Amino acid sequence: MSWRSERIWIELIMGSRKTSNFCWAFILFLGSLGFLLVGTSSYIGRNLISLFPSQQIIFFPQGIVMSFYGIAGLFISSYLWCTISWNVGGGYDRFDRKEGRVCIFRWGFPGINRRIFLRFLMRDIQSIRIEVKEGLYPRRVLYMEVRGQGAIPLTRTDENFTPREIEQKAAELAYFLRVPIEVF
């Protein structure tokens, strides 16, 4: 999602609050909870899940392994839910022609670098760069080459842009910033 006028362009970045992350976190939570319940029911000898009797799974070694997988899955699921709630990777890109400034903001993990805020002048932007890697998993990433700071990614590596979409986005941004486009 973006908002643009003659002088200002604001591009909102989604971050980790994507539908696929919600689905994976939910599926992983339910699966690991099921593994933990099966392992626990084999330990106490009572049916906590009525799908099959607990006598079919003995605690040593199957119950221990299922409990371990359940606990490990709950840890991974809680990590996913934390990244979703913190919106890691979310933020915005703000290009202001009137003031001649570019501001890039992203949310990070809690701690010292929770708020990642980059600010620089538009005249320091050397080019907009498109990096294309073809193959089994094609990757197209848009970078902004800044003097003294190197290449700053503007799109995520997991966004699946078609060649036409990434070229269109790069052309619009390069036109707005009045800088050349490089393709690698």
Curated annotation (Swiss-Prot):
Membrane topology: Multi-pass membrane protein
Keywords carried by this UniProt record: Chloroplast, Membrane, Photosynthesis, Plastid, Thylakoid, Transmembrane, Transmembrane helix
Signal peptide positions (record): none
InterPro entries: PSI_Ycf4_assembly
The keyword Heme belongs to this UniProt entry's keyword annotation: no
Localization per Swiss-Prot or TrEMBL: Plastid, Chloroplast thylakoid membrane
Chief localization: plastid
A Pfam entry, by short name: Ycf4
GO cellular component: chloroplast thylakoid membrane; photosystem I
Transmembrane residue ranges: 24-44, 57-77
GO biological process: photosynthesis
Similarity comment: Belongs to the Ycf4 family.
Record's function text: Seems to be required for the assembly of the photosystem I complex.
Protein name listed in UniProt: Photosystem I assembly protein Ycf4
Top-level taxonomy: Eukaryota, Viridiplantae, Streptophyta, Embryophyta, Tracheophyta
